[in-house]
């Protein structure tokens, strides 16, 4: 008889046939841990499985996939007002959130942490009162790259694929003119890259919001400004601390307005529009994380 409550593992269909994953699940089951497994086929499945998890009386719902899968499960838990904890099993291309919070790369270790690790309250962001992100919202150059990078290239090269595709597209990408407001913050101009982070990194390891914490009640903003991408990039790389092309801000909410349609990437999920309101919901979710997680204050 297991001393641990049952868990429900929600797998992105792309990672369901991973042999190491099957081995990790069977290993823990042999130890007496009760793990229910469900595989998503289309958008909305995660919400349905969480409703099932409530009926199964599990204490942890594990998101097995990339940043998009973690986002879908996390936002569904918050929308349902569930007290179940979120566990994380990194099976995606970039795994930005899992990497930044210190989830082990070894699947067996990650799965065990997701079930028996200590759960702590963390923040999550809501966007336009209908969707959200647990890690980061990115706009501009980075969003176009992650959206346009071919699936075959991502499968072959992982997070490096974003960099390669970005270098191929540098000469065609232009900035977005927009206005951004927050608590004691106002900026207007041409943005090459916008990062609004609950977490720190996106796009396969790019530290867009290096000071962000997931339990401080704040969103961290970083804007890379300028009209030409390559000169701005070289200026930033040469002297990041004093670069005139970087604007930082901190607030519990940000509003972005643009004269044209923009696209933000919310943990891998695109959202287009001319107006965005992003606000943090403090301590809205419980998540099983390593004891030395660097994103906790």
From Swiss-Prot:
Which PROSITE patterns does the UniProt entry name for this protein?
Answer: DAGK
Give the protein's cofactors: Mg(2+); Ca(2+)
Textual note on the cofactor: Binds 1 Mg(2+) ion per subunit. Ca(2+) may be able to substitute.
Write out the residues that bind ATP.
40, 66-72, 93
Q: Which UniProt keywords apply?
A: ATP-binding, Cytoplasm, Kinase, Lipid biosynthesis, Lipid metabolism, Magnesium, Metal-binding, Nucleotide-binding, Phospholipid biosynthesis, Phospholipid metabolism, Transferase
Which branch of life, at top level?
Bacteria
Domain DAGKc: from-to ranges: 2-131
Which residues does Mg(2+) bind? 213, 216, 218
* Enzyme Commission identifier(s): 2.7.1.-
Q: What is its main location?
A: cytoplasm
GO biological process assignments: phospholipid biosynthetic process
- Which EC class, in a word? transferase
The UniProt entry's sequence similarity note says: Belongs to the diacylglycerol/lipid kinase family. YegS lipid kinase subfamily.
- PANTHER family noted in UniProt: LIPID KINASE YEGS (PTHR12358:SF106), SPHINGOSINE KINASE (PTHR12358)
Function noted in UniProt = Probably phosphorylates lipids; the in vivo substrate is unknown.
Q: Check the record and name the NCBIfam families matching this protein.
A: lip_kinase_YegS, PRK13054.1, YegS/Rv2252/BmrU family lipid kinase
Instruction: Provide the protein name.
Output: Probable lipid kinase YegS-like
């Amino acid at each position: 008889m297991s001393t641990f409550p049952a868990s429900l593992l929600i797998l992105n269909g792309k990672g369901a046939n991973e042999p190491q994953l099957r081995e990790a699940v069977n290993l823990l089951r042999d130890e007496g841990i009760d793990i229910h497994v469900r595989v998503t086929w289309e958008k909305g499945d995660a919400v349905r499985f969480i409703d099932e998890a409530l009926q199964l009386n599990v204490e942890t719902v594990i998101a097995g996939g990339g940043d998009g899968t973690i986002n879908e499960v996390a936002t569904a838990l918050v929308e349902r007002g569930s007290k179940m904890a979120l566990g994380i099993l990194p099976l995606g291309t970039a795994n930005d959130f899992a990497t930044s919070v210190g989830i082990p790369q070894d699947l067996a270790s990650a799965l065990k942490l997701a079930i028996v690790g200590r759960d702590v309250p963390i923040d999550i962001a809501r966007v336009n009162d209908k969707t959200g992100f647990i890690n980061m919202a990115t706009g501009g150059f980075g969003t176009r790259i992650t959206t346009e990078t071919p699936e075959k290239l991502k499968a072959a090269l992982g997070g490096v694929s974003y960099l390669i595709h970005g270098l191929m597209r540098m000469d065609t990408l232009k900035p977005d003119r927009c206005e951004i407001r927050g608590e004691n913050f106002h900026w207007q101009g041409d943005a090459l890259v916008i990062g609004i982070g609950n977490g720190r990194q996106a796009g396969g390891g790019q530290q867009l919001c290096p000071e962000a914490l997931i339990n401080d009640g704040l969103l961290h903003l970083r804007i890379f400004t300028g009209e030409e991408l390559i000169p701005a990039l070289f200026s930033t790389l040469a002297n990041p601390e004093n670069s005139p092309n970087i604007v930082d801000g901190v607030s519990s909410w940000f509003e972005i307005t643009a004269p044209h349609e923009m696209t933000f990437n919310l943990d891998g999920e695109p959202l287009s529009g001319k107006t965005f309101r992003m606000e943090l919901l403090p301590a809205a979710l419980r998540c099983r994380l390593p004891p030395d997680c660097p994103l906790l204050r």
